[in-house]
C-alpha cells in the first residue's frame, strides 16, 4: 500500500501524479486491491468524479506500472524473522489481519499493516494507512475493534499500538 498526502510525495506513481493534477484532489491512497482519492472541502464530488475516473481508466489501459520500479507493496511490514512459538503467534496475527480486519477497514478507504510483534510485552504494532490514518476514530477502531479481536483469538497479545 502507498499513501500520498501531497503531489510532491506522489512522484513514485504516474497515476498518483495524474490524480494530483486534478484541482481539488488532496490525497491519494493505494490499497492492496483498491484506491482512495481524498478531496478538499472546497470542491464537490460532482465536478471531480469524471476527471478522476478518466485518469484511472487512462492509466490502467496504458499498461504502465502503478509505481516506478518494483515498489508496489511499500509499507510498514516487518522484516524480522520470528522463530518457534513466536513465528506461530505472528502467523495467527497476520492471518486475522488479512482475513477479518483489513477487509473491514478497506471498506472505509483505509488499510492496516502489520509492523512488528514484541514477544516480551505481547504488544502488536500496526500501521494505519489511507483514510484510517487521519480519521479521528482510528484510535477507537484500533483499541476497541482490532485489539479486542486480536486478544480474543491470540491470547499472547496484550495490547495493540499504532506506529507512524
Features from the language model and the residues they span:
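Domain-level signature for proteins that mediate thiol-based redox and metal-cofactor handling
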Residues: 1-164
Amino acid at each position: 500500500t502507498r499513501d500520498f498526502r501531497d503531489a510532491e510525495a506522489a512522484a513514485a506513481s504516474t497515476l498518483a501524479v495524474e490524480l494530483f493534477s486534478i484541482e481539488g484532489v488532496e490525497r491519494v491512497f493505494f490499497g492492496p486491491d483498491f484506491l482512495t482519492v481524498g478531496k478538499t472541502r472546497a470542491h464537490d464530488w460532482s465536478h471531480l468524479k469524471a476527471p478522476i475516473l478518466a485518469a484511472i481508466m487512462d492509466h490502467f489501459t496504458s499498461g504502465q506500472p502503478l509505481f516506478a520500479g518494483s515498489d508496489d507493496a511499500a509499507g510498514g511490514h516487518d522484516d524480522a524473522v520470528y522463530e518457534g512459538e513466536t513465528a506461530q503467534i505472528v502467523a495467527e496475527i497476520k492471518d486475522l489481519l488479512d482475513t477479518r480486519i483489513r477487509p473491514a477497514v478497506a471498506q472505509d478507504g483505509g488499510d492496516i499493516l502489520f509492523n512488528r510483534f514484541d514477544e516480551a510485552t505481547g504488544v502488536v504494532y500496526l500501521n494505519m494507512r489511507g483514510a484510517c490514518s487521519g480519521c479521528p476514530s482510528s484510535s477507537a477502531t484500533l483499541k476497541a475493534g482490532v485489539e479486542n479481536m486480536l486478544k480474543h483469538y491470540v491470547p499472547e497479545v496484550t495490547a495493540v499500538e499504532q506506529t507512524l
